[in-house]
UniProtKB/Swiss-Prot annotation:
The chain crosses the membrane at residues 7-26, 41-60, 67-84, 111-135. This is Disulfide bond formation protein B. Its main location: host cell. One of its GO terms (cellular component) is membrane. The keyword Transmembrane applies. GO terms for molecular function: protein-disulfide reductase activity. The gene is bdbB. It is found in: Host membrane. Disulfide bonds join 36-39, 95-102. GO terms for biological process: protein folding. Important but not absolutely essential for the production of the lantibiotic sublancin 168, it may also be required for the stability of other secreted proteins. Not required for competence for DNA uptake.
Length: 148
């Protein structure tokens, strides 16, 4: 794996997380969807990822990918849990009375693609690509300043 390959995957991860963040903001700020508690938790784990990746790109430090993989793994679990709640229309132990219901489906494409599923896919891609970078980079160097 060469340094250009690493930089390309870093950029891919950055754009994935950046567009995920922008999509989240679009639905809440432009479309005026009120995020539920689980949506907020997903945002907590998604929003720092593009910032961490940008700093990693600028400092040419691959170690930032560890934080990205950690954040995306937790975000993936929350997003998948949220999707299951929407599929089964069950109550969440996290959602409070008087707040937006976590089972409420705001957007649905093709009969099954909801916002938590889109979030799950985004987190899964970030997690998978990040994990691949970690595994492959061990062969290139000791995870320090991998690319120029």
């Amino acid at each position: 794996m060469n340094t250009r390959y690493v930089k390309s995957f870093f950029l891919l991860l950055f754009f994935l997380s950046f567009f995920g963040t922008m999509a989240s903001l679009f639905y809440s700020e432009i479309m005026h969807f009120k995020p539920c508690v689980l949506c907020w938790y997903q945002r907590i784990f998604l929003y720092p990822i593009p910032i961490i990746l940008l700093i990693g790109l600028l400092k040419k430090d691959l170690n930032s990918i560890f934080y990205v993989v950690f954040l995306s793994s937790i975000g993936l679990i929350i997003a998948f849990y949220h999707y299951i709640i929407q599929l089964t229309q069950s109550k969440s132990v996290v959602c409070e009375i008087g707040t937006n219901s976590c089972a409420k489906i705001e957007v649905e494409y093709l009969g099954f693609i909801t916002l938590p599923l889109m979030s799950s896919v985004c987190f899964a891609l970030i997690f998978g690509i990040g994990l691949k970078l970690i595994i492959k980079s061990k062969k290139l160097k000791q995870n320090q300043h991998v690319y120029n």
